[in-house]
Amino acid sequence: MAVFEAKKQTKVTLDDTIPLKCLVDSAEKREDHMEYCVKVQRGPIPEHSWTVTKRYNEFVALDSDLKLSNIELQLPPKKVFGNFDREFIAERQQGLQTYLASVADHHLLSNSLYFKKFLDSTNYSINIPEQALQHVSMVFRSEKGWDVVEPLPDIGWRIRKSYILVKPVDQPKVRQVLSWCGFGPDKYIPEKELNAIMKLLPTIQHPNISPVVFSTTTESGGLAIRAFQEKGTLRDAVCKCKPKNHFLKKYANPKSCTTLDLNAVKIVGKQILEALKFLHEKGLPYGHLHAGNVIMDGGNCRLLDLENWLLGLPSYYRAFFTQFKKINTCELIDVYCFGQLLYEMAYGRQLFAPTCDSFPPNSPPEIRSVLESILSPEACKGGLPSVENLLSHPFFSGVSLPPSDKPVLKIPSKLKEAIKNAKEQMEKRLKEEQKIINQLKRLSKAKEFHMSEEEKKKRRKSKKSTPRKALQENGDISGESSSSKPSEPTKTSDSSSTQSSKKTLSQDSDRSEQ
């Protein structure tokens, strides 16, 4: 390799949205305490697994961290005496398994740093907020227009994204929010082109896209600065919470929620669809639509975080739509995410599931029709509508939006090509992951069918009938016509044949049970 040739990045960036599955496999006594062996698997591939050992006190510490979510998690109680009793250990092991499963099944709890670090301390040991401050300080050495006011820790769900309150040097009373995040697993745009595209974000003009004050990249990640919204996001409004609180406290199980009235849902929905249509026509994928990325400005809504896709970050709903091979383009991802957002606005709570096959009986038929076309199992498996299809739906087509200036987004052809190539790479990774998930699903269903009671009965019945057939073929069943008594050597031959048949049957039985 030439001395000055650029080195290719070979490090695979971890996708934090890939679910972690865990099994409390065994318990071992270590001097004065018990250790529980937990098998962990990242994603659907069994080879991506490892084992961690945990003491009961570590489970207690995890539970203490997760209490701010306001979710009742059933951690097995502490016991002072009889901790080494065999029955007690077996009962506690099962209780710990149930506890971890309940955390893993919750979309927000399973994506929290507490849970990830508990199961995978190797990949989650870095102090991410401190690292973010260092990167921001480096940027501010050359961009001297802002000062840091204070960090805003854990206000968002994304582990590797940090928010910092800043102020312009020439307007010290103004507050703006800076978001920093390292590159994600879907970062495919070369650094030179990426920085040029990030510089374009402040030039975007659209009534339903939040303006960016400043944006740039470094060799490690990217940042964007926007006006600070005192009232927070649409999700903050729905959950009636303070924007600066921890995201688990705000969103996991809010004490009280509110819905948008039907007319507001129509207007906000139409505005979001128009913004998505605009981005799609310009060739700029979004991919990060959810209530936490929407702000309300009077009766107008605006989308946040257009930079997420450019930086290669995985979507909030990625673990959901990877289960459906028909949701395989950036445009369809936006439609799916729109369905999740529409559900949250209409019912005042997150769906927290990939699909929905039962809606509240008092749902207005118009909105129910839209939701079923996106979130029903049949729609996710069969195909989703396009943004244009949704805009022509009666629920949105009758909405008239106020006139506004012509939207502006000019992307040079060279940068458009870089975005197009990155989009193809991102969709390729998505399809490969969906293919693996579907293959493993089919394998699991086949195994489940093979081990069903009905199939076991069929195999047992087949075992009983096979020896009789073998004997009939050898002429050993009484009533079979014979003109003379068989000679002694023939008996020996028949006996050997019967034993051989039974032996073969026994081997077949062993294989079938395996």
Label each region the model flagged:
Residues 220-233, 237:
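Conserved short submotifs of the Hanks-type protein kinase catalytic core
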Residues 276-297, 303:
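Catalytic-loop of the protein kinase fold
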Residues 377-404:
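Terminal C-lobe "cap" of eukaryotic-type protein kinase domains
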Residues 402-514:
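Regulatory extensions appended to serine/threonine kinase catalytic cores
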Residues 268-269:
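Activation segment signature within eukaryotic-like protein kinase domains
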Residues 302, 308-369:
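C-lobe/activation-segment region of protein kinase-like
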Residues 211-222:
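Short beta-strand micro-motifs within the conserved protein kinase catalytic domain, predominantly
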